[in-house]
UniProtKB/Swiss-Prot annotation:
Superkingdom of origin organism: Eukaryota
Keyword Disulfide bond carried by entry: no
Self-association and partners: Interacts with ELK1. Component of the Mediator complex, which is composed of MED1, MED4, MED6, MED7, MED8, MED9, MED10, MED11, MED12, MED13, MED13L, MED14, MED15, MED16, MED17, MED18, MED19, MED20, MED21, MED22, MED23, MED24, MED25, MED26, MED27, MED29, MED30, MED31, CCNC, CDK8 and CDC2L6/CDK11. The MED12, MED13, CCNC and CDK8 subunits form a distinct module termed the CDK8 module. Mediator containing the CDK8 module is less active than Mediator lacking this module in supporting transcriptional activation.
Biased composition (Polar residues): 1347-1368
Protein name from the UniProt record: Mediator of RNA polymerase II transcription subunit 23
Implicated disorder: Intellectual developmental disorder, autosomal recessive 18, with or without epilepsy: A disorder characterized by significantly below average general intellectual functioning associated with impairments in adaptive behavior and manifested during the developmental period.
GO molecular function list: transcription coactivator activity
Encoding gene (name): MED23
């Protein structure tokens, strides 16, 4: 091949050589030149035609090498003309020629003439290269240019500029050689943010990159760097807050020139989240940290160090370190965060201590030094035994800096809890010294002079063998010697003995034959707070081991109340999670269950129901699954344990947070049976109600009409196979649409009331006619016999006023588990009986019998009966009768009302502050004993039956507390049925005080007002009543201003029904301001301080958000009005809203409005429509500047040139950034149905792109279907605008954005729909967008499309970017 090529080209070159040798003598005319070219090409064409496809590239490379081997510019020029003609006549493929020329090793800038001629040729033929080829050439040319040094002779610059001209041609927008988006991507790869382009390119490249700033802006959320989440709020777990763990930058899509602040590390965001209590899961989520992979994260380390420095600064200004003060809460939280992140090796302890030393050096901050040492002591004492001494020595360096005293530091007052902090440094020294001794290290660290008195005091205290509990000496000794077993036994032994009891004394517990060890006073919280994590771990380990030992021994003596209460308190500490709650759920519970220690099991479930706070949802769902397993075991089929298991399960189900339901239940999709009850219809109904509420509050089903393809489907189908049931139409109408559709399709035939009555009569006849006692007992308690026995007991009481002993025996034989079915039928039977009763005397008789069955005979507990009644699916009149029975049961006799009022009056919900709970608990049970084994009936029958059932220990529960989750359900049922509103008000008046003991009163109110928004719209009085009853029940246990605003309490609570209070703008501004100040960490904050460990909410912002939403939903104003008023806080000029942090206000509005029901936030769509229809976007003369300035909120705001469109844009972004994917899924419909018909101008189109562009990434990750619909809508709008305009001025930014959308998000998923639209556009647009469609008639030349190489911005194959299956 080479020989043939040589003969063809050398023939032509020969004549050139002669001409060069005798210049002037031989001169070719242009015609001769042409002839030579044609003959050379003719010979080459023949040769090329015989070549195989595989040899083409090799052939062209040889020709280039041959040309570059020539030294005469004229010869090179002639040969290049040959190549150009070969390309122009279609003989050679232009892409291959250009690539071979530029990739040639001999093309060097020093050969300036060759360089200039080569790039001239490339410039001539590059127009025929396909767009991907042009992209690859651009990359190679840019890299070639980089080989030119910074200084060259000015004589050669002109020649070198030929390369720049090729680049200029490639970047020329009107030439459209490739999507400009490809070009900017290649440029930004070589010249990222902050790197200057090569001098040869000058401003050519930077100007071109600048043309992409509008595209970058279209893809950016306005003020994104100022937006902050509420930790533990539903939105906080979504992708919006993710950061790069190495740089802390936002993960931005595409290599666009985004605004500078988006490229900065987002330290403020991470720092804000870290400052929030209970934020560690969110931090891991944001940074993609996984506990299983121990990876150090230096940026996180830096922020933790900065937080400690901030706490040191705060301590410097605080007068005193008071109990529950801001500074104490901050140090407490810091210690918890530090232990977690260092324990899982996301942060390195020695690095952090050295960094702290560096940042505190020379600052003179020493007021907080004891607290800092306390935080470090927590980690040191817990991990020094497992790590090298060298890791902890930097602490001594910190000591030298912070403790400059030359004299002794005096011993603090050990009656105060702060004394443990003052001793922290001495404790650290003791641990370091102990480690050095154990390691036989040469490094003996002498006791620092200033700490000598502290050390002597500890040594002396250790010699005192009888330690008292009245000061903090025991805590000090535990903290100092927790790594020294000889010394540690004494103080830890003293603690343990206090709560275990001395082994001899016994005290009674509620119920018959139930005794416990005699210690009743738990360890107080401030003592537990004063123990290091290491000491607390030893204590909790000791307790858990003792409980397991007692479980194995099947001890008949119950655990001491002090031990149970202390154990509950220890479980609040997140720092000891592995031995705490994790051990409780994964080890202790299963072990106790295996040992059949039912008393201890009952105790653990009671602890979980009444004493635990902030337990992570996966532990709660794990417990629920344990409970369903438990319920199926024969041994748990006894009244008290069965009741406890069901009550605990009910609490777990109803207390699930709306944003927790989906993530938790999707973990069980492969086997939904584990989290569902195989036999309890009530528990499964409770789960469906929770599902309905959760999907409503998170807007999960918004925009969908079926549960097909969603995670709910398997759960619902499994429930229907376990416990088939129906829902009353008034309950069903509140369900989200897809759930309604499911239950309408899966309708279950109900037994008619008439049949039920007939069956009862039939069984009653049998009862009366049978005479053999054993036959009667067998018949009525047999498995599979109809569950009508309670109906029979009712009939007996109605007719004979008593029940005989056989009745009692049958009940006993039926067993707790089977009896539930009898209660269910009885509930239906009661409704039938009451519906047909004649009223008057007969009705009173019915009520009396019913109450006797509960209170006199103890046949069924009130909470179970009410739960069954509330969960039946009666319609119309019968539903009203059912609720009438509930009301009678709760209010008619005094039994329950007295129990409630006494319990509320004598007890406080703040159990962590009490040391006498047990005494009050026992007094209450003496006055109102719980009877769970039909005792009343046993006493009444003739002859009376002696009951032998020993009670399982009851430490916390009673009928009032058990009734609370049932009351939650009752209120909801009453809300659904309009005619029973008055009865609900009466119930709230008499029993509302119980909400004082609800563990989530505000959340319950929030969920209720949110879920029933439609039902409560026109019932302002009832809403107010509900809020007043629940919030009012807490008035004695909460400081003023903890929840509702003063204005609301003054104006709304006292407003009359006919004249409701309508708030003004000032009210809304103050309400939003309250959340803004809370999130900014203002001190003192808008809400009183509290111990977040025992609060309903995990941090101040979550509390502020929920109470604000409750207050807004409780207003007697429509959702639309409230929504508009909230938007007006920033869209209207408000004197109360400071200009300088307007984005913080937008952030707060975004958080609040997205946490409210749809009517509140949907008003934003109306605002967007009015902006899009406003003259500044519809008329070309209204705004003559650059539209991107008009939409730039930051620039408009800073230059005081406020425009309503930029404000609305920024606010819409804040709202949508906080929205759930369900809320966002209304955007496609909004685009196609509302905006598409009105978008006619270029400004309007660009505004819509600005609005929705930044959210394509979330749609791609979370709901692909919506992303595809939006993609198509964007093209439809473009077609509209193109048809309505004579000329588009901003065609390039529009096309750049559409290319970005294709390569970053939609891929080819919208190709079919889009091709049709592009074919109808005007030529200039069609030319620019032709690469999106791949339609051959739009391609520049019939060039075979080449395979795309790896430098591409995104795949171009026929697939959607597959980050999510197209599920919805």
């Amino acid at each position: 091949m080479e020989t043939q090529l040589q003969s063809i080209f050398e023939e032509v070159v020969k004549t050139e050589v002669i001409e060069e040798a005798f210049p002037g003598m031989f001169m070719d005319t242009p015609e001769d030149e042409k002839t030579k070219l044609i003959s050379c090409l003719g010979a080459f064409r023949q040769f090329w035609g015989g070549l195989s496809q595989e040899s083409h590239e090799q052939c062209i490379q040889w020709i280039v090498k041959f040309i570059h081997g020539q030294h005469s510019p004229k010869r090179i020029s002639f040969l290049y003309d040959c190549l150009a003609m070969a390309v122009e006549t279609g003989l050679l493929p232009p892409r291959l020629v250009c690539e071979s020329l530029i990739n040639s090793d001999t093309l060097e800038w020093e050969r300036t003439q060759l360089w200039a001629l080569t790039f001239k040729l490339v410039r001539k033929i590059i127009g025929g290269v396909d767009y991907k080829g042009v992209r690859d050439l651009l990359k190679v040319i840019l890299e070639k240019i980089l080989t030119i040094p910074n200084t060259v002779s000015s004589a050669v610059v002109q020649q070198l500029l030929a390369a720049r001209e090729v680049i200029a041609y490639i970047l020329e927008r009107n030439a459209c050689l490739l999507p400009a988006y490809f070009a900017v991507t290649e440029i930004r790869k070589l010249y990222p943010e902050g790197k200057l382009p090569h001098w040869l390119l000058g401003n050519l490249v930077s100007d071109f990159v600048d043309t992409f700033r509008p595209t970058a802006r279209i893809n950016s959320i306005c003020g994104r760097c100022s937006l902050l989440p509420v930790v533990n709020n539903s939105g906080a777990i979504c992708n919006s807050w993710k950061l790069d763990p190495a740089t802390l930058r936002f993960p931005l899509k595409g290599l666009l020139p985004y605004d500078k602040d988006l490229f900065e590390p987002q330290t403020a965001l991470l720092r804000y989240v870290l400052e929030q209590p209970y934020s560690r899961d969110m931090v891991c989520n944001m940074l993609g940290l996984n506990k299983q992979h121990k990876q150090r994260c230096p940026v996180l380390e830096d922020q933790l160090v900065d937080l400690v420095v901030y706490a040191m600064e705060r301590s410097e200004t605080e007068e005193k370190f008071d109990d529950g003060g801001t500074s104490q809460l901050l140090w407490q939280h810091l210690s918890s965060q530090l232990i977690f992140f260092v324990l899982f090796q996301f942060a390195s302890f020695p690095h952090m201590v050295l960094s702290l030393h560096q940042k505190l050096a020379g600052r003179g901050l020493i007021k907080g030094r004891d607290h800092l040492m306390w935080v470090l002591l927590q980690f040191i004492s817990g991990s020094i035994q497992k790590n090298a001494l060298a890791d902890f020595l930097p602490v001594m360096k910190l000591f030298d800096l912070l403790y400059p005293e030359k004299e002794y530091i005096p011993v603090p007052d050990i009656n105060k809890p702060q004394s443990t902090h003052a001793f922290a440094m001495t404790c650290i020294w003791i641990h370091l010294n102990r480690k050095a001794q154990n390691d036989n290290s040469k490094l003996q660290i002498p006791i620092p002079h200033s700490l000598r008195l502290h050390h002597e005091f500890l040594q002396q205290s250790l010699r005192n063998k009888s330690l008292q509990m009245n000061d903090y000496k025991i805590a000090l000794l535990c903290n100092a010697y927790s790594t020294n077993s000889e010394c540690f036994t004494l103080p830890m032994g003293a603690l343990v003995e206090t709560i275990y009891g001395n082994g001899i004394m016994r005290i009674p517990l509620p119920g018959t034959n139930c005794m416990a060890s005699g210690s009743i006073t738990p360890l107080p919280m401030n003592l537990l707070d004063s123990l290091t994590v290491h000491a607390k771990m030893s204590l909790i380990h000791s307790i858990a081991t003792r409980v397991i030992k007692l479980a194995h021994a099947k001890s008949s003596v119950a655990l001491a109340p002090a031990l149970v209460e202390t154990y509950s308190r220890l479980l609040v500490y997140m720092e000891i999670e592995s031995l705490g709650i994790k051990g409780f759920i994964s080890q202790l519970l299963p072990t106790v269950f295996k040992s059949h220690a039912w008393g201890i099991l009952h105790t653990l479930l009671e602890m979980f129901s009444y004493r635990m706070h902030h337990i992570q949802p996966h532990y709660r769902v794990q417990l629920l699954s344990h409970l369903h397993t438990l319920a199926a075991v024969a041994q748990t089929n006894q009244n008290q344990l069965h009741l406890c298991v069901e009550s605990t399960a009910l609490r777990l189900i109803t207390a699930l947070g709306s944003s927790e339901v989906q993530p938790q239940f999707t973990r069980f999709l492969s086997d939904p049976k584990t989290v569902l009850s195989a036999e309890s219809e009530e528990l499964n109904r409770a789960l469906i109600l929770t599902l309905a509420r959760a999907t409503h509050v998170t807007d999960f089903f918004t925009g969908s009409d079926s549960i097909q393809g969603t995670w709910c489907k398997d759960i619902l189908q499994t429930i229907m196979s376990f416990t088939p049931h129906n829902w009353a139409s008034h309950t069903l109408s509140c369900f989200p649409g897809p759930l309604q559709a499911f239950f309408k399709q899966n309708n279950v035939p109900q037994e008619s009331r008439f049949n039920l009555k007939k069956n009862v009569e039939e069984e009653y006849r049998k009862w009366k006619s049978m005479s053999n006692e054993n036959d009667i007992i067998t018949h009525f308690s047999m498995q599979g016999s109809p569950p009508l026995f309670l109906c029979l007991l009712w009939k007996m009481l109605l007719e004979t006023d008593h029940i005989n002993q056989i009745g009692y025996r049958v009940l006993e034989r039926i067993g707790a588990r089977a009896l539930v079915a009898h209660v269910r039928t009885f509930a239906d039977f009661l409704v039938y009986e009451f519906s047909t009763s004649a009223g008057g005397q007969q009705l009173n008789k019915c009520i009396e019998i019913l109450n006797d069955m509960v209170w006199k005979y103890n046949i069924v507990t009130l909470d179970r009966l009410i739960l069954c009644l509330a969960m039946r699916s009666h319609e119309g009149n019968e539903a009203q009768v059912c609720y009438f029975i509930i009301q009678l049961l709760l209010l008619k006799p005094n039994d329950f009302r007295n129990r409630v009022s006494d319990f509320v009056k004598e007890n406080s919900p703040e159990h962590w502050l009490q040391n006498d709970w047990h005494t009050k608990h026992m007094n209450y049970h003496k006055k109102y004993p719980e009877k769970l084994y039909f005792e009343g009936l046993a006493e009444q029958v003739d002859p009376p039956v002696q009951i032998q059932s020993p009670y399982l220990p009851i430490y916390f529960g009673n009928v009032c507390l058990r009734f609370l989750p049932v009351f939650d359900i009752v209120i909801h049922r009453f809300l659904e049925l309009l005619p029973v509103s008055k009865s609900l008000e009466t119930l709230l008046d008499h029993l509302g005080g119980l909400y004082k003991f609800h563990d989530r009163p505000v959340t319950y109110l929030y969920n209720t007002l949110h879920y029933y928004e439609m039902h409560l719209r026109d019932r302002a009085f009832l809403k107010r009543k509900l809020v007043h009853a629940i919030i009012g029940s807490l008035k004695d246990n909460r400081p003023q201003g903890w929840c509702l605003s003063d204005t609301y309490l003054k104006c709304a609570m006292n407003a009359r029904e006919e004249n409701p209070w309508v708030p003004d703008d000032t009210y809304y501004c103050r309400l939003i301001g309250r959340l803004v100040d809370t999130m900014a960490g203002k001190s003192p904050g808008p809400f009183p301080n509290c111990d977040w460990r025992f609060n309903e909410f995990p941090n101040p912002a979550a509390h502020a958000l929920h109470v604000t939403c409750v207050e807004l939903m409780a207003l007697a104003v429509s959702g639309k009005e409230v929504g508009n008023a909230l938007l007006n806080v920033v869209l209207k000029s408000q004197p109360l809203v400071p200009r300088e942090n307007i984005t913080a206000w937008m952030n707060a509005i975004g958080l609040i409005i997205t946490a409210l029901p749809e009517p509140y936030w949907i008003v934003l769509h109306d605002r967007i429509v009015s902006v899009i229809s406003s003259p500044s976007l519809t008329s070309e003369t209204e705004w003559v500047g650059y539209p991107f300035r008009l939409f730039d909120f930051t620039a408009c705001h800073q230059s005081y040139s406020e425009m309503s469109c930029s404000y609305t844009l920024a606010l819409a972004h804040a709202v949508w950034h906080h929205s759930s994917i369900g809320q966002l899924s209304l955007i496609p419909k909004f685009l196609t149905e509302v905006l598409l018909p009105i978008v006619k101008t270029e400004f309007q189109l660009l505004y819509v792109y600005h609005l929705v562009g930044p959210f394509l990434q979330r749609f791609q990750q979370e709901r692909t279907r919506c992303m595809i619909e939006i993609g198509v809508a964007f093209y439809d709008m473009l077609l509209n605008v193109d048809q309505c305009s004579t000329h588009l001025n901003y065609m390039d930014p529009i096309c750049d954005f559409l290319y970005h959308m294709k390569y970053m998000f939609t891929g080819d998923s919208v190709k079919e729909q889009v091709e049709k639209i592009i074919c109808n556009l005007k030529p200039a647009l069609k030319l620019r967008l032709r690469f999106i469609t791949h339609i051959s008639k739009m391609e520049p030349a019939a060039v075979p499309p080449q395979a795309m190489n790896s430098g591409s911005p995104a795949p171009q194959s026929n697939q959607v970017p597959v980050s999510l299956p197209v599920t919805q």
